[in-house]
Amino acid sequence: MSSKQAASPFTCKAEGEEEMTGDLASREMNECKDQIMASHLPLHPLNHNKPHSEELQSLVTTLPADLDWDSMISSQHRMDSESNKLRSLYSFRTSSTSPHKPDEGARERSDLMSSVNFGTPERRKGSLADVVDSLKQKKLEEMTRSEQEDSTCVEKILSKDWKDKMDRLNTSELLGEIKGTPESLAEKERQLSTMITQLISLREQLLAAHDEQKKLAASQIEKQRQQMDLARQQQEQIARQQQQLLQQQHKINILQQQIQVQGHMPPLMIPIFPHDQRTLAAAAAAQQGFLFPPGLSYKPGDNYPMQFIPSTMAAAAASGLSPLQLQQLYAAQLASMQVSPGAKIPTTPQPANAPGTLSPTGMKSEKRGTSPVAQIKDEAAQPLNLSARPKTADPIKSPTSPTQSFFPMSKTSPVSLSNKSGIPSPIRGPSLDILSSLNSPALFGDQDTVMKAIQEARKMREQIQREQLLTPHSIDGKLPINNMGLNNCRSDKMLLDAVTGKICIRSAHTERTHFENLGPQLTGKPNEDGKLGPGVIDLTRPEDVEGGATVVEARVYRDTRGRSSSEPHIKRPMNAFMVWAKDERRKILQAFPDMHNSNISKILGSRWKAMSNQEKQPYYEEQARLSKIHLEKYPNYKYKPRPKRTCIVDGKKLRIGEYKQLMRSRRQEMRQFFTVGQQPQIPISTPTGVVYPGTISMATTTPSPQMTSDCSSTSASPEPSIPVIQSTYGMKLDSGSLGGNDLMNGEDEMEMYDDFEDDPKSDYSSDNEANEAVSAN
């Protein structure tokens, strides 16, 4: 289309040329007009088929040539040139679609020339003019047709919709479409608002998710940091524990070295009185760790009623070490102090403490503060002391205190060893001979002195045995309890600084002197009623003679309180409750034979309280009648009540049952920390077969001789054992040997208790029940 529009200026030029040459060629071409038209008709469609640009260019090139020919040559030449042009034009058109051949062009040219040359010259001129005219007309028609085609193309480009829009395009309509109607504006605002809210919610969701991710990451980082801190703390704690273990091991090594180096210096012996949990653990550890070596045997004369440990161990116990650490410390001490061949433990002799001979009777006339039992009662709450009064006497300051001999003053006094017991007794086996066990150079440094002392002691023992055979009546199978105390540890004793502590050993001369002085009270003659004297252990019974670990309990016979042994026991008159309960108790026992007496008493007490005064009236009348009869029968009767069965522990007043439960719980707690091994008791027999069990006996988990309880009940079940050392203080001597001292230890009358049930019937026991034997629980 652009080519057609560009061809329009050329068409104008052709029209101007046509006007200039029209007059000249009109006359020449009139004659041959028909022929030329006939010959050129087939060319029209070819011209139409050609593009307009090519067609116009060919015409533009031919028109100047025609003008030159008209002016220069004749019409003949003009016709020839025209015919040549036409032939060349035709050949060009045909060559546009097919390759040009020279022979074909020559043939066409000859044919055309023959056709053109046909006729007269006038006719040829006319035909040429006609051809030119026809060409001009065709060109004009083509120009008009091209203009029409241009207009149709524009119309096609501008579609009807576009025309409509262009027609409606004005300022008012444009402004209206831009501004819009109120409804459209409201709709658009609503859409915008919803879109804004959606965007805001989406933004909030994104922010929340981002915050959650941040929090999660922060929490993970915090957890990791905490785990790292925990691991670091655990590592530090492990390092501290290892450091503490190393320090403790170092301390143990130092203590072992001190014990080995300073073994010749007697350590300060501190008694262990378990009053709280820490010292309970220390005492149990002492019981476990500081046991006597198995080579030493002990007899009734062993003056060792309390467990002692070195001051270093007591300081360790008081420093708050854990039970495991104490146990390790004691085990290390024990391992370092084991007696082995070649080891030398020097001895420390003890000088004469006080002149004269001290008898147990004289010791009993002293205050209780001079005996170790007073110190025990002052230091700790014990089960047997239910109404103890504080003692202010210091046993260490007293010249007659047995503990005075535990602290040596000099090392120059002679050493004398003897049998542990003042009672001459043959030895059943070599393992039981303490002199044989002591006859070792590993125990003492000065071997010559030791051997001399041992020989002298053996001679004295043989002499005592001969005297015993001559006077067998001096020992009648009875041993006063007081003879086994600490009171006989006197000036002529020595301190054997053995493996675990101080062992006070009597000399044979002192033991013989004491037995000569105590002849009347060693007879152990039965009383008028056939019972043994008070405070005497009957070792002639079959179950007691077997001795050793088979001795499960010690039979102790107590005398009647507040009267001599010859006075009969006077029962109190029954009160109204007892009159009523006598028959009721019998009924309950018939219905329930296995019911315990304490439960029956509880039932009877509740029933008595529920009774009315009218129901109780006949029983009160019976009480008055019985009281009158009792007063007539015993006009000088005076009731001496027993002390209340209560005890004060840690400032609290407890009944005996509560106290036993407390002690049982403490023992159970102590067993959780320590396991005390069994130390069997070594019996020592006389020629008559009498067995004297050692006064130092360790209580074990199995039934073994334990401390005799002054407040034990016959109906109480055996309690779990506690590591104690059996003390035989608190017993009575025979009234004849005391020389008028009816009480056991002067002012301490109220500290001995008879066992009885809580029910009032115990006040109405018979004479035979007053001296019943009580088993030590």
Curated annotation (Swiss-Prot):
Residues 398-422, 701-729, 765-777 have a biased composition (Polar residues). One of its GO terms (cellular component) is nucleus. Gene3D superfamilies: High mobility group box domain (1.10.30.10). It holds the Pfam family HMG_box. InterPro entries: HMG_box_dom, HMG_box_dom_sf, SOX/SOX-like_TF. PROSITE patterns: HMG_BOX_2. Keywords: Activator, Developmental protein, Differentiation, DNA-binding, Isopeptide bond, Nucleus, Transcription, Transcription regulation. Residues 100-111 have a biased composition (Basic and acidic residues). SMART domains: HMG. Residues 745-758 have a biased composition (Acidic residues). Coiled coil: none annotated. GO terms for biological process: cartilage condensation; cartilage development; chondrocyte differentiation. Transcription factor that plays a key role in several developmental processes, including neurogenesis, chondrocytes differentiation and cartilage formation. Specifically binds the 5'-AACAAT-3' DNA motif present in enhancers and super-enhancers and promotes expression of genes important for chondrogenesis. Required for overt chondrogenesis when condensed prechondrocytes differentiate into early stage chondrocytes: sox5 and sox6 cooperatively bind with sox9 on active enhancers and super-enhancers associated with cartilage-specific genes, and thereby potentiate sox9's ability to transactivate. PANTHER family: FI18025P1, TRANSCRIPTION FACTOR SOX-6. This is Transcription factor Sox-6. It comes from Xenopus tropicalis (Western clawed frog).
